[in-house]
């Protein structure tokens, strides 16, 4: 059992003004507690998240991001040459209109049997996993859980 975290979730976790910040905080908090098993992301998701943070929030936010990934206990899968080649082929074929990073995510999920996917892009990824969590997730929580998420969010995703 495991969950794969998409770029948008990790970006929203670090951008307190993002419309999905509370959902991202709740998803990551529950992922870290093992609700779906081990939380995974790929090295390409790390790169993509870092680029988004730099372009939208500046250098300080971008430079702070990779350290919390390891500190938080997220498992980062490094894209090797074979996975990169297969992802490039998927990207070139235009399968599901996936970007290169998204294609690597699909390949890792398939290879590892990851059944849950955290994303705010349900249109593109809604059928990629048995369990897709994202927008509105925080609304499904109890008041006590929402309070915990608010504390986690205020403490800040480590950055």
Predicted regions and their residues:
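Short glycine/serine- and small hydrophobic-enriched flexible loop segments
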Residues: 51-54, 110
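A general alpha-helix detector
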Residues: 9-10, 47-52, 86
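Short, well-structured N-terminal submotif of metal-dependent ribonuclease cores
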Residues: 1-41, 54-64, 140, 145-146, ...
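Alpha-helix/helix-capping structural signal
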Residues: 8-9, 44, 82, 123
């Amino acid at each position: 059992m495991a969950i794969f975290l998409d770029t948008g979730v990790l970006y929203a976790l670090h951008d307190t003004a993002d419309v999905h910040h509370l959902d991202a905080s709740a998803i990551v908090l529950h992922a870290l507690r093992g609700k779906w098993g081990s939380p995974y992301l790929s090295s390409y998701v790390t790169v993509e998240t870092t680029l988004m943070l730099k372009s939208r929030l500046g250098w300080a936010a971008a430079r702070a991001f990779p350290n919390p990934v390891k500190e938080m206990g997220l498992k980062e899968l490094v894209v090797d040459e074979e996975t990169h080649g297969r992802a490039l082929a998927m990207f070139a074929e235009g399968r599901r209109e996936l970007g290169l990073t998204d294609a690597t995510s699909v390949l890792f999920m398939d290879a590892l049997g990851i059944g849950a996917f955290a994303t705010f892009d349900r249109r593109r990824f809604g059928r990629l996993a048995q369990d897709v969590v994202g927008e509105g997730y925080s609304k499904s929580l109890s008041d006590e859980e929402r309070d915990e998420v608010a504390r986690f969010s205020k403490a800040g995703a480590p950055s």
